């Protein structure tokens, strides 16, 4: 199929494979929706610390993948 976009639930990542750290759900929701997701929230005490998790994030937006954060 061409022209079909899919979405996934994931930690949104910066270009260096680092997550966006957070403290408030509202900041993550704003970041996620600005990048085309349905919504987002701050995942507290998760695998990557307190980080933004997005719901239905488009495929063209980077997500945290296996490997180290390259700061």
UniProtKB/Swiss-Prot annotation:
Transmembrane segments: none annotated. Expressed by the venom gland. GO terms for cellular component: extracellular region. Gene3D superfamilies: Knottin, scorpion toxin-like (3.30.30.10). Disulfide bonds join 18-69, 22-42, 28-52, 32-54. GO terms for molecular function: sodium channel inhibitor activity; toxin activity. GO terms for biological process: defense response. Residues 1-6 form the signal peptide. Keywords: Disulfide bond, Ion channel impairing toxin, Neurotoxin, Secreted, Signal, Toxin, Voltage-gated sodium channel impairing toxin. SUPFAM superfamilies: Scorpion toxin-like. Residues 71 form a propeptide. It is found in: Secreted. Residues 8-70 form the LCN-type CS-alpha/beta domain. PROSITE patterns: LCN_CSAB. The keyword Transmembrane helix does not apply. Pfam families: Toxin_3. InterPro entries: LCN-type_CS_alpha_beta_dom, Scorpion_toxin-like, Scorpion_toxin-like_sf, Scorpion_toxinL, Scorpion_toxinL/defensin. Has the structural arrangement of an alpha-helix connected to antiparallel beta-sheets by disulfide bonds (CS-alpha/beta). Belongs to the long (4 C-C) scorpion toxin superfamily. Sodium channel inhibitor family. Alpha subfamily. Alpha toxins bind voltage-independently at site-3 of sodium channels (Nav) and inhibit the inactivation of the activated channels, thereby blocking neuronal transmission. This is Sodium channel neurotoxin MeuNaTxalpha-12. It comes from Mesobuthus eupeus (Lesser Asian scorpion).
């Amino acid at each position: 199929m061409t022209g079909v976009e899919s979405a996934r639930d994931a930690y949104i990542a910066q270009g260096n494979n680092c997550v966006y750290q957070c403290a408030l759900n509202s900041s993550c929701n704003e970041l996620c929706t600005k990048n085309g997701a349905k919504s987002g929230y701050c995942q507290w005490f998760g695998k990557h610390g307190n980080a933004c998790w997005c719901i239905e994030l488009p495929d063209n937006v980077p997500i945290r993948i296996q490997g180290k954060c390259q700061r």
